[in-house]
Amino acid sequence: MIRFERVSVRYEGTERPTLSGVDLTVPEGELVLLVGPSGVGKSTLLGTVSGLVPHFTGGLLSGRVTVGGRDTRTHKPRELADLVGTVGQDPLAHFVTDTVEDELAYGMESLGLAPDVMRRRVEETLDLLGLAELRDRPIATLSGGQQQRVAIGSVLTPHPRVLVLDEPTSALDPAAAEEVLAVLQRLVHDLGTTVLMAEHRLERVVQYADQVVLLPAPGAAPVMGPPAEIMKVSPVRPPVAELGLLAGWDPLPLSVRDARRGAGGLRERLADASPPETASVPEPPAPRKAPGEPGMPGMPGAAVPVAAERPRTGRVAPLRGRGARGPPPPPAPPPPPRPGRRGGAGRGGARPA
């Protein structure tokens, strides 16, 4: 259905191509998941399918991308609208009408379909996506999952054979994401639509994919295969697959259900195992003290003895820092003698006659 033949894409001002040597085929009627680290060109690859690359984004596209026999380099996006539908991360950025029903009909109006055909397809899409009760609702009042379903419905009414989605659930909560994924499964299994999608939250999608395309690095050739096999070599994988890799399970689990099935033998092995003994921490040595002097509390084993010198009357010992230089300052002079009390004898003197 989708054929990439030695496809490379280079944008102006970049030293290396974003895509290089892409040569693969996406079969018809399958859900194919595109994975890889950020910045490897996933959105660029999706854009070559819809014709947005290079017609809108610019850049140099070499090689050939064909969808249903049409070359996307020689066919502009409007000439592919009846064949390829595109849904992005933010549906609000693509809506052009105010209500659900009008949005579903807009794409068909642009293609010039007959009014009776438009009405029939709108009703079919409302029922397929569970939007019948929302047909007259303003789009701005819908939840995130409902808006994404409307966005998918708006590109389904022209009956495209290919649906391209760029992280359709990344901005949705888990409940809304489940709504969107349920719709995609119905499109693949009930209508035979070919779905090519990139998704950051792999734990939500990977168990539903028929095949996975891995872009390991910018400009690197992609790798395509079954999800469990690709997850073994992918630099990004869902947590449950990471657990299976650490436990040595083969094939890797792609869902919690798969992990529970694969954990049966692990539970049996751990049933008779005793927990490892915790290593005892040795007691720190007692602090040493100077002979005949009390110790100063400090780090274990490193008590500091107090100075042996005693303070003397009439002398001030300055506290000197570590970096002080030069001789110590002279001692302070002794205090003057105290005068005798008025009307009394002075200190050590005789009482006046």
Language model features: what each stretch is:
Residues 138-142, 146:
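Conserved ABC ATPase signature
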Residues 10, 53, 64-79:
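ABC ATPase NBD Q-loop/coupling interface
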Residues 159:
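Conserved catalytic motifs of ABC-family nucleotide-binding domains
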Residues 116-134, 308:
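Conserved ABC ATPase "signature" region
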Residues 163-166:
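Catalytic Walker B motif of ABC-type/P-loop ATPase nucleotide-binding domains
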Residues 155-156:
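ABC ATPase C-loop
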Residues 215-253:
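Conserved beta-strand-loop-alpha-helix hinge in the C-terminal portion
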Residues 152, 180:
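Hydrophobic anchor residue at the start of the ABC signature
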